[in-house]
Design a protein with these regions (language model features):
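General secondary-structure edge motif
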Residues: 41, 45-49, 104, 151, ...
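Alpha-helix initiation and N-capping motif
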Residues: 6-7, 98, 150, 165
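Short, flexible segments with low predicted structural confidence
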Residues: 32-36, 40-41, 95-97, 103, ...
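Bacterial Sec-dependent N-terminal signal peptides
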Residues: 1-25
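The N-terminal extracellular segments of secreted preproproteins, especially immediately downstream
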Residues: 18-21, 44, 156
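Short, well-ordered surface patches within globular domains
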Residues: 49-146, 183, 189-192
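N-terminal low-complexity, Pro/Thr/Ser-rich intrinsically disordered segments
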Residues: 24-57
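A well-ordered secondary-structure block
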Residues: 122, 126-212
Length: 212
């Protein structure tokens, strides 16, 4: 059965991008949080670097997700304490969703890195684009083209930001989602991924991540 969960917490409506975007080269997108992320071994996480059908921010979203999967403990130690600086809507003081995320990532074992997949990307792109045009929130495809191109076993949708690290942190925290579905998908046993970030008439931006 396909897993379909989505993040629709109203707070994302007002998210202001904080996390800066930069081209990678040899510098990790997480280098600002610890120089340890610049270790050459983490370059394998940039699996979408040479992909021509994704934007730079979409590639970066896959990159930071793979970094979190490859070394969840280091991500927990270096990035999560700064989560509120990246998104002001993440409460790092004494909030249950954040605390459970820290506990999970501190003890979990490394996961495989995700490879970009064109079918997942087409699925995500169609949904992000059509949802954005009509201000839709959810997983149901809006037209026959998107229904035919739907390709995922797990899907995460985020509304309000186009900044890769902010998107990832909001999905990982999964505030207001008791099932923690987004967190479980992002840290789940998938192999392939497609990402699309598009304008949204209601929330300014929407991001769709399709996993297979």
């Amino acid at each position: 059965m396909k897993t379909t969960t989505h993040l629709i917490t109203i707070i994302v409506l007002l998210l202001a991008p904080i996390c800066g975007y930069c081209k990678h080269g040899d510098t990790s997108p997480l280098a600002a949080y610890s120089a340890r992320w610049n270790d050459p071994k983490y370059r394998v996480c940039n699996t979408a670097e040479q992909v021509g059908y994704m934007t730079e921010k979409e590639k970066e979203l896959i990159y930071v997700l793979n970094l979190a999967r490859m070394n969840p403990k280091l991500f927990c130690e270096t990035v999560l304490p700064r989560a509120h600086d990246i998104s002001s809507f993440i409460d790092t003081s004494n909030e249950v969703y954040y605390k459970t995320l820290v506990a999970t990532m501190r003890q979990m074992t490394p996961l495989n890195i995700l490879q970009p997949d064109s079918l997942c990307m087409v699925s995500a792109r169609c949904h992000a684009t059509t949802s954005g045009k009509v201000g839709y929130v959810g997983h149901e495809r809006r037209n026959e083209k998107c229904r035919k191109s739907k390709y995922y076993f797990g899907e995460c949708c985020n509304y309000g930001s186009d900044e890769p690290l902010e998107i990832l942190l909001l999905l990982l925290e999964d505030h207001g989602v008791p099932s923690l579905g987004h967190r479980k998908i992002c840290l789940g046993t998938y192999n392939k991924i497609g990402v699309a970030i598009a304008p949204h008439t209601t929330y300014e931006h929407n991001a769709v991540m399709d996993f297979y």
